[in-house]
Amino acid sequence: MTKQNSPLVLGTEPIGKLLTQYAIPAIIAMTASSLYNMADSIFIGHGVGALAISGLALTFPLMNLAAAFGSLVGVGASTLVAVKLGQKDYEGANKVLGNVLILNVVLGVAFTIAFLFLLDPVLYFFGASENTISYARDYMRIILYGNVVTHMYLGLNAVLRSSGFPKMAMYATLASVVINCALNPLFIFGFGWGIKGSAWATVISQVISLTGQLIHFSGPKQLLHFKKGIYRLHSEIVKGILSIGLSPFLMNLCSCLIVILINRGLKEHGGDMAIGAYGIVNRIAFLFVMIIMGFNQGMQPIAGYNYGARLYSRVTDVTRLTMRWAVGVATLGFLLCQLVPSWIVRMFT
């Protein structure tokens, strides 16, 4: 492991420099991830139709709920790994890695089974109509088939960042984005798979990125790597992961509930086109949220490591700096959406 990839620099390098090194790759990855979500909408809108966009919008709460469970493990594991590394407890950090893998498999399988059986009632509850249910069902069923992959991919990416490889985490996300954007038009227009093609493009791209992550953590020379003895779930580690990840989980859950309520209201008072329009607005807002989340993801390893090393002033410094950047990005997003809203929306139709 090079000095640049060593987590030890988290306790010595200037905070501003560290936040730049860790946040920029995360921002690029999160922004690209948001852009490929927007690309899904653009390809589906032009290749399938407006009702398909409405169907896609109906899946947003369920995908957000899946992301909530992903953040429950991913954010908790990322922070706990950083704390363990700050304490120089490398064996403990490896056990967190093993527990992340098992937890993601368990939660992913449980989530998939539950919602495959309840998919239609859930989508109708979210605001689906007879015109949009087939699009939402076709898309979400395939996404659920790949849900375990999504959970593992998100969890391991979080550990990558915390273990000193923010750029590798970025490359994993960028690879998923590029592959998804390449497969989307091929599957939708070339093969004529419609909205199912977009879902398959998403799943396949994440499988490829997950494969790269598994190869990285299989290397015995890495500080954190797969080995015997780390896969048994430890109550202390699981409790630590879930307690840290509970806050972002509840935030995502509340976001999911808000979207459900709005979709149901729009179905009653605006119809399918109104739901589609709201879906477009959500995708645009999501872009700026992803940038802010990129700063948060860049901050977590720095704050976690220094907390574990008992360098509390550095934890305060990185938190304050991250908050300033977040306010700036949110203000920029607000101004753009107020000044040029029609130009932004035209991309989707």
Go through the PLM ranges and name each one.
Residues 1-23, 202, 213-255:
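Interhelical loop/hinge segments that connect adjacent transmembrane helices in multipass membrane
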